[in-house]
Amino acid sequence: MSKYAGIVLAGGMSSRFGEPKALAIWKGTTFVEHIVKVMGNTLQDIVVISHTDIKERVEQFVQVPVIEDIPHYKGNGPLAGIVSGMEYIEADWYAIMPCDAPNVSHEWFTILLEQTNNEYDAVVPIINGRKQPLLAAYHNRVKEKIYALLQEEKRSMGQLLSQCNVKYVSGEDVQANADWFINVNTKEEYGQAQKDLSNE
């Protein structure tokens, strides 16, 4: 069993974006391929959780396994994606990453995983006062908590955190790099991110 593994969440319907965000172009490739490459600098075992409609297209861009949600929980949001990844790869800790935060640096995964220890169930950054539970790390033991929530038809990441012993990370190295955690949810945000990229 690996100590650490990565789960990339690329199964959302991207309704506000208008097309699958996982396949949006970024730095000459796609969001999902870019995220997998960045994560791959720190982690060897990575799985991508994809939606049925785009799974075959995602597989063309990444060299890691691409799976769908566990059938019984398909469509139940990020909790379903996380637990599906946990079932696919055995590890002590899982770094979670949505496919729509393309500014993330490989440094973040080093910082994140250095904070893990068995005293905690999760390590979650706080950026500008807001918890970021989808750019976080979760211990394997959280899997049973997720199953219990899904059985009760509860899908909120906040509900999961309320049941976990969480280490919140908000140090200077995180706050100084708040752009790592910016999500691209709309075409307008995508255009701004592309503009910022060209100005670097």
Swiss-Prot record:
Residues that hold GTP according to the record: L9, A10, G11, K21, D69, D100
Transmembrane segments: none
Keywords: Cytoplasm, GTP-binding, Magnesium, Metal-binding, Molybdenum cofactor biosynthesis, Nucleotide-binding, Transferase
GO molecular function terms attached to this record: GTP binding; metal ion binding; molybdenum cofactor guanylyltransferase activity
Classification via Gene3D superfamilies: Spore Coat Polysaccharide Biosynthesis Protein SpsA, Chain A
RNA-binding listed as a keyword: no
Matches recorded under CDD domains: MobA
Annotated GO CC locations: cytoplasm
Chief localization: cytoplasm
Top-rank taxon: Bacteria
Family, per entry: Belongs to the MobA family.
This protein's domain notes: The N-terminal domain determines nucleotide recognition and specific binding, while the C-terminal domain determines the specific binding to the target protein.
Function statement: Transfers a GMP moiety from GTP to Mo-molybdopterin (Mo-MPT) cofactor (Moco or molybdenum cofactor) to form Mo-molybdopterin guanine dinucleotide (Mo-MGD) cofactor.
Protein name: Probable molybdenum cofactor guanylyltransferase
Organism listed in the record: Bacillus cereus (strain B4264)
